[in-house]
Amino acid sequence: MNDVATASSGLVQAAARPNLVRINLVGLSTIVRKETRRVVRIWIQTIVPPAITMTLYFIIFGQLIGSRIGQMAQGADGQPISYIEYIAPGLIMMSVIQNSYGNISSSFFGAKFQRFVEEMLVSPMPGWTILAGYVAGAVMRGLMVGVIVLGLSLFFTKIHLYHPFVTLSTFLLAAVIFALLGFINAIYARKFDDIAIIPTFVLTPLTYLGGVFYNVAQLPSPWREISHANPILYMVNTFRYGLLGVSDIDPAWAYVVMLAFVVALGAFCINLIHRGVGLRT
């Protein structure tokens, strides 16, 4: 009798697994579609502003100031790299970072504010599905903006692609890292003003001090050593290495740093969801 009951229980569990997988896939795809449609629906807020901002950066720093600076480094092909060529990868990465972060922080906090996040929490979807859906939506916006800024940069300078895998993987890792950070910000935020605190006082300074506009190797000590504590430095330089073949730091070490951030932040976000921090009232 016990054998029959055990066998029946096993059959029920085996039959339930495909249903759970299907539920997870449906939930994940639904969140991703919702986030993508949101970005496209309000494109004048999500796509146009960063495009205008980066165009101004290219004009002011690249054309007006960059023409007076001259050569910044020597490329992988032995050709000199002008200032506008040097900052172009950093500006692309800056747009990816800011938009990946901003998308998920505002979207998930909106879900909290409108209280429909509670419906997701009581659904059969596990926490990682909710997190993956919102992160994928943020990465999608980062991809859209990054491609647009890349296209705009072609009006001001030529863009190389020396290491396609390095370029794409760095883009994805950076977008995921700052999407996870934006998720944490949305979790702890209690009002809409809290969403702007981290980008204003943390994200913007780290971005400007992350080697976007200058070569970190040229900094005097101890500022050069202090700059290596900035995680954005590793993303910007690895992305620059993928496009231009030059970097201030070892790309292998940069990958270690970025992967460590993805694992640590991902685990922390899932833990926050399971504990219901900032989600359950």
Model regions: which residues?
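Alpha-helical transmembrane segments and their short interhelical loops
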Residues: G127-P199, V246-I270
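Junction motif at the cytosolic side of a transmembrane helix
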Residues: N2-L11, L64, L243-V246, V256-T281
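Short helix-capping/hinge motifs at transmembrane helix termini and TM-loop junctions
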Residues: F61-G70, Q98, S153-L161, A189-K191, ...
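Hydrophobic alpha-helical transmembrane segments of multi-pass membrane transport proteins
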Residues: T53-I60, S82-F156, G182, T200-F201, ...
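Aromatic- and glycine-rich beta-strand/loop motifs that create alpha-glucan
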Residues: G10-A51
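Hydrophobic alpha-helical transmembrane segments of multi-pass membrane transport/permease proteins
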Residues: R41-R68, I87-I97, T204, V257-V263
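Pore- or pathway-lining transmembrane helices of multi-pass membrane proteins that form conduits
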Residues: V48-T53, K191-G210
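Membrane-interfacial helix-loop-helix junctions in multi-pass membrane proteins
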Residues: T207-A264
